Amino acid sequence: MKKNLIIGCMAVFAVSVQAQEGWTLRQCIDYAIEHNISIRQSANEAKQSAVSVNTAKWARLPNLNGSAGQSWNWGRTDVRIGDEQKYISVSSHSTNMSLSTNVPIFTGLQIPNQYALAKLNLKAAMADLEKAKEDISINIASAYLQVLFNQELHQVSLGQVELSKEQYARISRLAELGKASPAEVAEAKARVAQDEMSAVQTDNNFRLALLDLSQLIELETPEGFSLAAPVVKLDLEPLTPPDEVYQTALSTKAAIQAAQYRLEGSKHNIRIAQSAFYPQLSFSGSLGTNYYSTIDRNFGDQMRDNFSKYVGFSLSVPLFNRFTTRNRVRTARLQQENYSLQLDNTKKTLYKEIQQAWYTALASESKYTSSSTAANASMESFKLMSEKYD
């Protein structure tokens, strides 16, 4: 409700604010965006998505692995000496080294679809971050205006107390001259007490609103926290029709963009699941060599002479995997349907908020006009009442 009220007020009034002292609305919003925990979490999620994009980008490159091993053996073994088979105790050791690589050639278009999905997920995460900033900005604007509203109410209540005291003093003087009854004096005195009680209540409301705002922007302590005294210029402007606002919001609202990116990404998610239906082709190669202490040759000669090379292709053809791939595709399609429903729901929610804000703005405009008329009438009534007791 507060959100709609803020949007409505902003739609009716073009407010030019010049800060005199304390925190301005812009400063409150900037501070909250920098320190709000939810926004910082959303920013980290966006960074994680960026890392995922980088990972998917280089998935087609070959991998390269090196390995080295050293082993020792002790025990009895059978050897042939001449025509005899004998068992002797021996100790030996061996060394091996290798370098291998593997290159994906065809993966059923899994790699390009994973890269496309990662980029869309990054865009969605960035849109989520913008939505978090929008939400905190609206909440702070609402709390900021509530502080100013309560502050103004308190000033009005203090003015009412002074006015009641003046009326009480005037009636008391008239009573001394016999021109006012004791009942009128008692009534004026009671009005002073009632207005003083109202002033205390409005002061409490102002302090609580200020505390809420300081907590919302993540201030460590509310001590010394105050708002800038704004110089406000109000200009009534024609309201933009809600349908026109809605069409503009569809292309700019972060929540809509995030839902659209996720729906688009679900198409690639289906293709990733379908890639398991296709054969997988890869190329591999390796280089290796080894040394055996049981061979009567030095280390360098053996490492050179035992050097081996290998290259080959590997083709994997899926035949039957207990319907796992089929069910993954079904799950991906259901997820796509959910993302489509989520987008529709986000659009409906946006249109509802715009309609509510538009009617709130219309009511605010009417209330402002009638309040101005009532204020002028009250001033005229006050002048007449003052003349009555003078």
Identify what each model region corresponds to.
Residues Q41-A56, A132, I136-Q155, A209, ...:
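Amphipathic alpha-helical coiled-coil segments
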Residues V51, K133-T248, T360, S364:
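Periplasmic alpha-helical coiled-coil/stalk elements that build and connect Gram-negative outer-membrane
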Residues A19-G69, G75, T221, L227-E264, ...:
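Bacterial Sec-pathway N-terminal export signals of envelope proteins
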Residues M1-L25, N36:
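Bacterial Sec-dependent N-terminal signal peptides
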Residues Q20-A143, L281, G285, F323-R326:
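Short flexible linkers and secondary-structure junctions
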Residues S67-V103, P230-P238, R271, S284-V317:
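Small/polar, glycine/serine/threonine/aspartate-rich low-complexity segments that form flexible
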Residues S98-S100, Y144, Y246, G312-S314, ...:
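Membrane-embedded beta-strand positions in outer-membrane beta-barrel channels/transporters
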